[in-house]
Amino acid sequence: MKNVTLGDYIISFDNTLTKEFCEGVCEKMKNDTRRSIGIVGRDKTLNLEIKNSYDLHISPLADWREEDGIFFTTLASFKDKYMDTLQENTGLTPDFFANTGYGYASNGDVFADTGYQIKMYEPGQRYNWHHDYIIDAKEGPRVLTYIWYLNDDFEGGETEFIDGTVIKPERGKMLFFPSTWMYVHRGKLVTKGNKYIATGWFYHQHPLTNSMFEDK
């Protein structure tokens, strides 16, 4: 097996969304008064020392249905590309990933995508050092994070990982990385202009866990 680093699991793809689509989402988010100050953690608390952004979960909203559908089809395609690239980077086989919760469901397991959040950062806002791992009571543990960068006409706002990896926001770029505690990262301070991203997670739903929440 080759020598594998944490950085091998941090993978991005360029131009996954069109310029027109990205611009439309940014403009729509800018004008949507339902956005709210972002919350953090399983307890969904407000902590501006950690996270300072405006968030909107678009998937339940009827007037965002078209955008939600485009995010869904794009995610479905590039999640598979992520797994293919990950195998190339690590030399590991699909059989390995089938037993570790990274994208290949087996034995009744389900990997749930729970929808998309649009985030807007104004100058002076950021998301400080954190990791994305939580265990949701119904959805299970998060296993994979994805981010779309919707614009790049701002300054600052890079995604930085604790190992020194830095991702420069570029319109249409999509980033994947594991949601575990080992992938501590931050969205750096935006210093000029507004930054827009869309983000979400895959959750690993074990069949035993799912059965606990079935209607009796």
Enumerate the predicted regions with their spans.
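Fe(II)/2-oxoglutarate oxygenase catalytic core
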Residues: M1-M174, M182-K216
